[in-house]
C-alpha cells in the first residue's frame, strides 16, 4: 500500500495505512511496518513522530515539543522532557526547546515583556524575574497543549497563542 492518510492531531489516524502522520502533514512510506504506526512507540529507530500532547515522549525514543519532533538515540524518561521553553509570543516560531526566555531567546524588545517557563509535561505558573504581562495585570500566562493550564492564571492559553482574560478563570472555563 502506498496511499497516504489524512493528517490528524493524534497518531492513531495512521493505524491502517502506510503513513506516518503529524499534526501538519502526512508522509507516505513505501512499506507497512510490522508494528502499526499509530502509536508514538512505533518510532523504535530513533525517529519519532510528533503529536499535540508532549506526553507522547514519555516512553518512546522521541522528544517532542509543541513545535517539532526531535529524534534521540535512547528512550527518554519523563525527566528528559522537562526543559523549559518560551512562550510563543517570546520568540515567534522558536517557541519551544529553549533553555529560558531570558537567556536563549535574548532580552530584546521582541521578547519582552514575558519571560515564562513551562516543562514539556506539566504547565506551571513559575515565571522568570520580570515576568509581567500588563494586559494580565500582575499575573503572567504561559502556553501549554491543553487549555487547562489557565486554572490558576488570569489567562486562557492555547498551544499557539496566549490570550489574556479580564478575570482569573476556573477549570470549568477551560
Swiss-Prot record:
One Gene Ontology CC term in the entry: cytosol
Protein name in UniProt: Keratin-associated protein 9-2
Keyword Repressor assigned: no
Keywords attached to this entry: Keratin, Repeat
Residues in Sequence repeats: 8-12, 13-17, 18-22, 37-41, 42-46, 51-55, 61-65, 66-70, 75-79, 80-84, 85-89, 90-94, 95-99, 144-148, 149-153, 154-158, 168-172
Location of the region described as 17 X 5 AA repeats of C-C-[RQVSGE]-[SPTQ]-[TASP] in the Swiss-Prot/TrEMBL record: 8-172
Organism: Homo sapiens
Keyword Kinase recorded: no
Single GO term (MF): identical protein binding
Entry's family note: Belongs to the KRTAP type 9 family.
Pfam families from the UniProt entry: Keratin_B2_2 (PF13885)
Highest taxon of source: Eukaryota
Chain segments annotated as transmembrane: none
Function: In the hair cortex, hair keratin intermediate filaments are embedded in an interfilamentous matrix, consisting of hair keratin-associated proteins (KRTAP), which are essential for the formation of a rigid and resistant hair shaft through their extensive disulfide bond cross-linking with abundant cysteine residues of hair keratins. The matrix proteins include the high-sulfur and high-glycine-tyrosine keratins.
Annotated gene: KRTAP9-2
Assembly, per entry: Interacts with hair keratins.
Amino acid at each position: 500500500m502506498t496511499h497516504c492518510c489524512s493528517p490528524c492531531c493524534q497518531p492513531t489516524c495512521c493505524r491502517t495505512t502506510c503513513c506516518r502522520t503529524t499534526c501538519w502533514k502526512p508522509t507516505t512510506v513505501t512499506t507497512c511496518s510490522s508494528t502499526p504506526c499509530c502509536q508514538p512507540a512505533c518510532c523504535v529507530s530513533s525517529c519519532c513522530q510528533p503529536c499535540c500532547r508532549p506526553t507522547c515522549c514519555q516512553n518512546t525514543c522521541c522528544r517532542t515539543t509543541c513545535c517539532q519532533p526531535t529524534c534521540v538515540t535512547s528512550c527518554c524518561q519523563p525527566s528528559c522532557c522537562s526543559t523549559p521553553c518560551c512562550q510563543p509570543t517570546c520568540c515567534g516560531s522558536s517557541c519551544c526547546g529553549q533553555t529560558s526566555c531570558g537567556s536563549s531567546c535574548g532580552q530584546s524588545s521582541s521578547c519582552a515583556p514575558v519571560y515564562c517557563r513551562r516543562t514539556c509535561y506539566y504547565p506551571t505558573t513559575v515565571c522568570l524575574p520580570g515576568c509581567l504581562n500588563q494586559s494580565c495585570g500582575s499575573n503572567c500566562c504561559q502556553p501549554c497543549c491543553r487549555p487547562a493550564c489557565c486554572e490558576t492564571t488570569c489567562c486562557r492559553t492555547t498551544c499557539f497563542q496566549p490570550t489574556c482574560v479580564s478575570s482569573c478563570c476556573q477549570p470549568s472555563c477551560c
